[in-house]
C-alpha cells in the first residue's frame, strides 16, 4: 500500500510539473514580443562642420597712372629723328666776344655765364667755343666734316652717315635751338673724348645741373641720342629738370619718355 501511495504521489508531481511547463510554453508562445530584440536606436546624424567659405582676397588698389607733363620750349627735342620746329625763334645774347663771338638764348645766357665764372673760380679754364648756329653755319660744318672724311679715305657714299654721328645734319642740331653750348678746357683745346679727363669737364659734369644744364650726350648713349659721346656739349633744360635728369642718370630722350606727352 505504501508503494502505491508513493507512485501516485510521484505521478501527481510529474503531472504538476507538466502542467507548469505547458503553462509556461503557452505563455511564451502567446507573448512573442517579449523575446523580440529591441530595435537599435537610430544613430544621431553627425553634424558636419560647415566648410568655411574662402576669404576673398582684397582687390589691389591700382597704382595711379602718373600724370604726364606738358612740354615747354626749354624741353624741345632736336635730334636725328626730330628736326628743329619750322617756326622756331630765339632771342640771343652774347656770351663770348672772342673772334666772331658766341651767342646763346637769353633765357639761359646768365646761367651759362655764372656757371663759367664759378668753374673758373674753382681753378679751371673753361671756354665757350660754340653756341647758337644758323642753318648756314651748321650746313658748312656738316659739309666740312664729310670732306675731311672723304679726304681720309672714307667712301663718299658712306661719308654723310658717318659725319652725322659727330656733326648733326642741318636742321637736327641743338645748337640751332640756341640752348646748347660747347665748352672746352683751354689746356686741352680739342673736341674729343680726351676732354673728359680735364679738370674743367670734371667740374662741369658734377655741377652743371645746378645751373640748369645737362651733359647732353653721355658716354654709352649714342644709340639713344643718335650722337657720339661729347664730353663738352651742354644743354639748358631749366633748374628743376636738370636736377631730375642728373639724379636719374638718364638722357633727355629717356627723361621725356618717362614724364611727358609723346611728340605728335
Language model features: what each stretch is:
Residues 2-264:
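Extracytoplasmic cell-surface/polysaccharide-interacting catalytic and binding patches
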Amino acid at each position: 500500500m505504501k508503494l502505491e501511495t508513493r507512485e501516485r504521489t510521484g505521478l501527481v508531481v510529474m503531472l504538476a510539473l507538466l502542467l507548469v511547463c505547458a503553462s509556461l510554453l503557452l505563455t511564451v508562445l502567446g507573448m512573442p514580443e517579449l523575446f523580440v530584440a529591441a530595435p537599435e536606436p537610430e544613430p544621431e546624424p553627425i553634424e558636419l562642420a560647415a566648410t568655411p567659405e574662402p576669404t576673398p582676397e582684397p582687390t589691389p588698389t591700382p597704382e595711379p597712372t602718373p600724370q604726364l607733363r606738358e612740354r615747354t620750349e626749354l624741353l624741345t627735342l632736336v635730334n636725328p629723328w626730330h628736326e628743329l620746329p619750322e617756326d622756331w625763334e630765339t632771342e640771343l645774347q652774347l656770351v663770348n666776344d672772342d673772334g666772331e663771338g658766341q651767342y646763346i638764348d637769353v633765357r639761359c645766357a646768365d646761367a651759362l655765364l655764372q656757371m663759367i665764372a664759378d668753374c673758373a673760380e674753382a681753378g679751371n679754364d673753361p671756354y665757350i667755343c660754340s653756341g647758337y648756329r644758323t642753318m648756314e653755319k651748321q650746313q658748312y660744318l656738316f659739309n666740312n666734316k664729310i670732306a675731311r672724311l672723304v679726304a681720309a679715305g672714307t667712301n663718299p657714299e658712306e661719308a654723310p652717315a658717318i659725319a652725322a654721328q659727330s656733326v648733326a645734319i642741318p636742321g637736327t642740331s641743338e645748337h640751332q635751338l640756341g640752348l646748347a653750348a660747347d665748352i672746352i678746357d683751354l689746356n686741352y683745346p680739342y673736341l674729343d673724348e680726351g676732354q673728359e679727363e680735364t679738370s674743367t669737364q670734371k667740374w662741369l659734369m658734377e655741377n652743371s645741373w645746378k645751373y640748369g644744364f645737362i651733359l647732353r650726350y653721355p658716354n654709352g648713349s649714342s644709340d639713344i641720342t643718335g650722337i657720339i659721346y661729347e664730353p663738352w656739349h651742354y644743354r639748358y633744360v631749366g633748374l628743376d629738370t636738370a636736377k631730375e635728369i642728373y639724379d636719374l642718370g638718364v638722357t633727355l630722350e629717356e627723361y621725356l619718355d618717362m614724364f611727358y606727352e609723346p611728340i605728335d
